[in-house]
């Protein structure tokens, strides 16, 4: 039996984009910082890292599709923060963003990590953006790094 898994180390030549929504920027800025930190700590070259900003989480799938279609990137780390309010808006935005991101990843068969927070309140978002629950941006980039390695291994 063979166990195949990705390594948490970049070669240093991977071109990566961090796609981030600006809405709830107090949270998403911290997620982005965590992702950038992880990229650098695990051998990424800052010159090969692009930050792409969109207005909100609903716009993430369209721009992710454009980034993957361009074939400019080896992978994309997608970040955002959708916080539940008093209307069903949260449900619509989170469902469509999630479906759209997964759809683009499968359409192009490219490594994409999902770091879009969906929380019931601002406190939960803050916890996941660098306090009690760690930084989910850092975790999303870690996932992307492993995916990049695993895809390269499976490619042969």
Curated annotation (Swiss-Prot):
Entry annotation: catalytic residues: 89
One BP term from GO: riboflavin biosynthetic process
CDD domains attached to this UniProt entry: Lumazine_synthase-I (cd09209)
Reactions performed catalytically: (2S)-2-hydroxy-3-oxobutyl phosphate + 5-amino-6-(D-ribitylamino)uracil = 6,7-dimethyl-8-(1-D-ribityl)lumazine + phosphate + 2 H2O + H(+)
Binding residues for 5-amino-6-(D-ribitylamino)uracil: 23, 57-59, 81-83, 114
Main EC class the enzyme belongs to: transferase
GO CC, one annotated term: riboflavin synthase complex
InterPro entries: LS (IPR034964), LS/RS (IPR002180), LS/RS_sf (IPR036467)
Enzyme Commission no: 2.5.1.78
Family of this protein: Belongs to the DMRL synthase family.
Function, as annotated: Catalyzes the formation of 6,7-dimethyl-8-ribityllumazine by condensation of 5-amino-6-(D-ribitylamino)uracil with 3,4-dihydroxy-2-butanone 4-phosphate. This is the penultimate step in the biosynthesis of riboflavin.
Protein name: 6,7-dimethyl-8-ribityllumazine synthase
Organism per entry: Helicobacter pylori (strain G27)
């Amino acid at each position: 039996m063979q166990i195949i898994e990705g390594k948490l180390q970049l070669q240093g030549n991977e071109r990566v984009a961090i796609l981030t929504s600006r809405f709830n920027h107090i949270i998403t800025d911290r997620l982005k910082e965590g992702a950038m930190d992880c990229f650098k700590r695990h051998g990424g070259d800052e010159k090969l890292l692009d930050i792409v900003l969109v207005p909100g989480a609903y716009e993430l799938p369209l721009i992710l599709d454009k980034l993957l279609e361009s074939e400019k990137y080896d992978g994309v780390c997608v970040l955002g923060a959708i916080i539940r309010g008093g209307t069903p808006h949260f449900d619509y935005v989170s469902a469509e963003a999630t479906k759209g991101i997964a759809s683009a990843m499968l359409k192009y068969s490219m490594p994409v990590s999902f770091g879009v927070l969906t929380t019931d309140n601002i406190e939960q978002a803050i916890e996941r953006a660098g306090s009690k629950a760690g930084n989910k941006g850092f975790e999303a980039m870690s996932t992307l790094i492993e995916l990049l390695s695993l895809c390269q291994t499976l490619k042969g």
